Amino acid sequence: MNKILVTLLSVTILVFIAQACSKLEPKAPREEDLLDGPVEGLSHEQSRRFLAGDVAFNDEIFTEQTGLGSIFVATSCGTCHAGDGKGTPFTTLTRFGQTDSNGNQYLHLGGPQLQNRALPGYTPESIPAGATFSKFTPPANTGLGFIELVSDADILAMADPNDDDADGISGVPNYAHLPAFISPAANAIPRNGKYIHRFGKKAAAYNLMHQTVNAYNQDMGITSNYAPKDVYTGIDIDPEVSNSTVQNVVFYLQTLKAPIQRDAANTEVIRGKNIFTQIKCSSCHSPQLKTGYSPIAALNNKTFYPYTDLLLHDMGNGLDDGYTEGSAKTSEWRTPPLWGIGLSPNAQGGQYFLMHDGRAKSIEQAIEMHGGEAQQSKNNYMQLSSQDKEALIKFLKSL
């Protein structure tokens, strides 16, 4: 009898321990809860390049000995894009000096980007007196390869510069000159020697090569064969990062997976999606786009769901920082993709920092800050019942 009791007691203890361990043991996150990771369908060689770019982007921390500075913003790419997610007010960068008919009058004073940190013995930059400026929080990096492959024709098809349909929304592309190291896409549609740009808060970068080279040079003070000018001295110097490293980082950014919607079949999420359309949020945050041709099969002719039109929209006086880039006006901002917005707190310390400078601390606040072309959609949102607002936010958090 005692043996039976001992056996039962032992079994009970083992079951208790197993249950306790199951609660304490960390579980791997679901794939849809992660922002980083490669797009499905890469070949063995493409996976190798992705991993090489991953290491260069996230693990390589520059020092004075490896080319950092002399003035800079960050010491690595991953500093501002933790887990390939959005940045915070602690990782913002500052752009200054409004361009007018005579060009940017502050280029000789370090514009347009402020390098606010410096190596010992050097002086970091400060914003010149009288210069307009804007602070930008780093964006999430996921799905960028899909966005890069949207054709100019498709972007122009969403534009309505004269508001011909009288809906109050008149999105326009940002046209700007290309740097010497960038060749336009085969299907590019230029205007007066300028090309449609699509990356950045004001769509100031043409493609991911443009964005990456600028980040190395302006964020970290790292020269390359593509951008050999030292940001401190203004003199061309030997490259501090190799062509292959830059190209691997570009490939890494191109092949990061797109954010995966969660709980798409939830009835409240579906209802929120319908409300999103009804109050005309989708007029700018276009749900569906398609890539064109790509030598990367995983990106070639794919339909994807970023919730952006890649166009500039006038967002009103409340979001006018007095700073412009390319053909963008001071109050115009590129429609940010909404995919991944529900996962933003994972990279932002458990809370939201939305809008171009992180001023909105919730999705609700971000909506309420919309003005200009988005004023009517904001008004429609404000008139929703509390239940409908909750459904809309639930949908947005599922993206």
Task: Tell what function each PLM region has.
Residues 21-399:
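Periplasmic c-type cytochrome electron-transfer domains
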Residues 8-16:
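Bacterial N-terminal signal peptides
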Residues 1-8:
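Bacterial N-terminal signal peptides that target proteins for export
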